[in-house]
Amino acid sequence: GEDFEEVEAGAFIEYVASAMPLAPVSYRLLACEAIEQAAGVNDDPATTQARDSALERERIASHLGWLAQVGRQLGFTWLVHRASTLQLQVRDANRSRLVELEPALRALGTRLGRTPLLKARLKGIGVLPTESSDLRGPVARAANEGGDAWARLWQRLAEISASLDLIKGAGEPELPSLCDIGVVSGTGESTVDTPRGEARLSLSLEHGHVKSYKLDTACSHHIGLVAKLVEGRELGDALVAVGSLDLSPWEVAP
């Protein structure tokens, strides 16, 4: 990072998490892992499971937030209400509560599949140029399934189901917190699959302080797709196309 003043490791984690308000758990985990690698500290399996559960819970909540946004764009009031309500219920839920919410989450997917007007508005919208490269996350995974806004919707729904399954087999979700690293020095890096795709962080640690870092986010790669997606499109379709990328303004490099 440019214009970055050396900061204590714990404060750096808070800085990174608060700088990314749409995916704070993902970026907290990213910072913890990079610092722990720099310090030569390894997590125990229970901590890893708890962190993974928290990451998947954030993925579910994030995708529900995206679905609510789709509802707002298209004027589907029921979708805005249902997805927003579920998002709030998921955000801080423990494992047993998430299991309880599974039928409601699956029912939402079923209803979306039975909404012909939704398919009509999303199918063929936001098709990526064939030369698109370095795609990440749901945008990349949907590229082989039609690569349009409709495919991205179904990719995110599939990820909600997959995340639920992972949580059922993992530990109780816990916010990542830094292991005791002492005042060590070293370099570390980490990669986390955030709700919007892979984020990578490399950093330099000196006497327990982060001296410098470099952060690479999925959205910083996807922002370049916008111009092609809106070219020659009516405003409504252009907004849906861009919305289907789920860009976070905080995660787009200046």
Residue locations for each model-derived region?
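Active-site bordering "gate/hinge" segments
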Residues: G1-P254
